[in-house]
A protein has these predicted regions:
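SAM-dependent transferase fold signal centered on methyltransferase-like domains
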Residues: 1-150
Length: 150
């Protein structure tokens, strides 16, 4: 059962441990996994608890107390548009995070053993701003093999 925080603001201090498969920071509050959009691994943050379920918590980033060395300032219009999910991360670290997000998804949803041997390093784009693309590739396992369709 999902519950909102009943109008009460509860701000908590979290250390972010890793990036989730949707690009959100993951920390733990009272041993419960807590997702915080905009937070990065190794950061100490203050977040407001906005939703809690029996399995997880969603927090809203209030303040970064100890920023990641990979955090970069972004233009205000980027942060407001919602189109730049990892724009607050240095580009080199974005490439690493994106590969790790894919590896985590393969491991979590497809139980592919050692997927790191199947996924090459993320290729850098010559253009890192002012373009927009989105690719989605449906994947499935059939007869023990991964298949992709478009």
């Amino acid at each position: 059962m999902k519950k909102k925080n009943g109008g009460k603001k509860l701000n908590v201090l979290l250390t972010i441990k890793k990036i989730g498969i949707n690009g959100e920071g993951i920390g733990y509050y009272k041993k419960k996994i807590t997702f915080v959009k905009g937070a990065l691994p190794d950061e100490v943050i203050v977040c407001e608890i906005v939703e809690e379920t029996p399995k997880y918590i969603i927090g809203k980033l209030v303040k970064v107390k100890e920023p990641s060395p990979h955090r970069v300032e972004i233009k205000k219009e980027y942060s407001e548009s919602g189109a730049y999910g990892l724009a607050h991360v240095s580009y080199e670290k974005q490439l690493e995070y994106k590969r790790n997000i894919l590896l985590d998804a393969f491991d979590k949803y497809y139980r592919i053993p050692k997927p790191d041997k199947l996924v090459l390093k993320t290729l850098a784009s010559p253009t890192t701003e002012h373009y927009r693309n989105k690719n989605q590739f449906p994947l499935a396992v059939r007869n023990g093999r991964v298949i992709a369709g478009l």
